[in-house]
């Protein structure tokens, strides 16, 4: 049943992507660069803290934003298949948990003007559901809710997001490569519609338990943004720490 559900969702997303892209190509686009550092600290096999430090820069206008994200997650649930693999945001091969619950807080400000152009505070909650397949293929569903306070007057709104992720690990001696693709529609309460869709393709590579590098190309289509079509190059440095207890 779950395998059939994943196949149906995948086919629907592929059809949605094809229909969306056909109406996009003729429109103007903007390009951005997104460098990021992610710090991970695992203190038990199931519990983990992390901090993201992402930046964004518009190549044409030079506009920049910076964010700080602090979050905690808890992995739980065993698959009927015993799966030992390195996932996108993991430092080493471990027995995979099929569910993950995450919560965190984000602060974003425009840079160079002390947040006068844009400022946001956001509390978010995530649920991840993972389905492993043969040949180290993994299909994940992520449901996320964002509670947002935007601007000087802290105007409240919320978003609901669903992300479908497909990834696969390849190993060669100590090197682990995890290519992936994902698609994510956003529902925004300010517009009472699905106004944004993101398509991402990339890979994560690691050859040591402490460091991993991730690179991806992101395309974003937003019908209610000042920039309707956005292309971004996202480069992420993952740095991992863990206690002795977490390694058991």
PLM feature spans:
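Start-of-domain marker
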Residues: 27-95
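Residues that define the transmembrane beta-barrel architecture of outer-membrane proteins
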Residues: 31-33, 64-68, 119-123, 154-160, ...
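Membrane-embedded beta-strands of outer-membrane beta-barrel proteins
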Residues: 37, 70-72, 125-127, 162-166, ...
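Residue-level signature of outer-membrane beta-barrel architecture
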Residues: 41, 74-76, 92-94, 129-131, ...
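Repeated loop/turn-to-beta-strand initiation elements of outer-membrane beta-barrel proteins
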Residues: 46-51, 79-83, 96-101, 134-139, ...
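Transmembrane beta-strands of outer-membrane beta-barrel pores
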Residues: 53-59, 105-111, 131, 145-149, ...
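Outer-membrane beta-barrel "beta-signal"
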Residues: 71-75, 79, 127, 229-248
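Detector for outer-membrane/organellar transmembrane beta-barrel domains
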Residues: 129-130, 136-184, 239
């Amino acid at each position: 049943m779950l395998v059939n559900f994943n196949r149906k969702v995948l086919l629907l997303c592929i059809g949605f992507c094809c229909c969306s892209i056909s109406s996009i190509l003729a429109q103007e686009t903007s390009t951005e660069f997104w460098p990021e550092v992610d710090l991970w600290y695992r203190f038990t096999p199931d519990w983990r803290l992390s901090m993201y430090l992402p930046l964004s820069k518009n190549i044409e206008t030079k506009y920049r934003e910076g964010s700080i994200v602090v979050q905690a997650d808890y992995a739980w649930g065993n698959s009927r298949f015993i799966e030992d693999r390195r996932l996108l945001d993991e430092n080493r091969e471990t027995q995979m948990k099929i569910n993950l619950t995450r919560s965190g807080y984000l602060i974003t400000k425009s840079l160079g003007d002390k947040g006068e152009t844009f400022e946001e505070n956001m509390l978010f909650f995530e649920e991840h559901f993972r389905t492993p397949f043969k040949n180290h293929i993994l299909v994940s569903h992520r449901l996320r809710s964002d509670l947002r306070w935007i601007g000087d007057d802290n105007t409240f709104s919320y978003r609901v997001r669903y992300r479908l992720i497909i990834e696969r690990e390849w190993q060669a001696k100590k090197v682990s490569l995890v290519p992936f693709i994902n698609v994510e529609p956003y529902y925004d309460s300010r517009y009472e519609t699905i106004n944004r869709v993101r398509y991402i393709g990339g890979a994560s590579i690691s050859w040591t338990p402490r460091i991993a590098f991730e690179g991806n190309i992101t395309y974003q289509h937003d019908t209610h943004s000042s920039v309707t079509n956005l292309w971004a190059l996202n480069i992420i440095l993952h740095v991992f720490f863990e206690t002795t207890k977490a390694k058991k």
